[in-house]
Amino acid sequence: MSIWVDADACPGVIKELLFRAAERTRTPLILVANQPVRVPRSRYVRRVQVAPGFDVADNEIVRCVEPGDLVITADIPLAAEVIAKGAHALNPRGERYTTSNIKARLNMRDFMDTLRASGVDTGGAPAMSQRDRQAFANELDRFLTANR
């Protein structure tokens, strides 16, 4: 089992939690981005830099992910693709995407895209809070404990 990170948009505080978890559990952690990402020296952590472009990092994750792997992403279409391949998906706020909820999340995302395209200001996600960080850490720990 490996952890894949959609690293371009992943908050730094979440990456730090992931670095520590990878070391603690000796789990391979791969950060995929189309720009340079700093990672600690570790036998468990590596980065993959892909060419710039829309969805290039996402496509690399989908290409490489295996059933049972965990993908960290806030990108709902990416989450849907990796779930379809038998992997797991967790967003940086600690919400697990599953076969039970991913269709509803995709529908809501598409609806919000339609609203934005028609000129409606839908706002954005609130800033990452301590509660979000804790929710992520807790869900990551639950996943790693259950999947060792």
Swiss-Prot record:
<dbReference type="InterPro" id="IPR003791">
    <property type="entry name" value="UPF0178"/>
</dbReference>
<protein>
    <recommendedName>
        <fullName>UPF0178 protein Mlg_1612</fullName>
    </recommendedName>
</protein>
<dbReference type="Pfam" id="PF02639">
    <property type="entry name" value="DUF188"/>
</dbReference>
<comment type="similarity">
    <text>Belongs to the UPF0178 family.</text>
</comment>
